[in-house]
Amino acid sequence: MNIHEFQQWVKDYYQQRKWSDLDIFVRIGFLAEETGEVARAIRALEIGRDRPDEVEGTYREHLVKLTEELGDVLGNLLVIANKYDISFEDIL
């Protein structure tokens, strides 16, 4: 899937669930939340979490989690771009 196809998929997916109707400031909050989750995933990969209430995962598990979180950040960026009719290809 190329970036244009992914941007259209995100647009359709969010519209079906009425998530694209949310206020832009709510969306910015979601983006900030997902960015924090990327930071958490990188911390787990690089220095570990060192929390007694969490099971330590493998490097591969942490890498999968980071990949998912980066996808969530990209999805949120695409929703914002879609709101303002900005093509991700134009951004790149």
Spans of model-derived segments:
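Flexible "arm" and connector segments at domain edges
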Residues: 1-70, 74-92
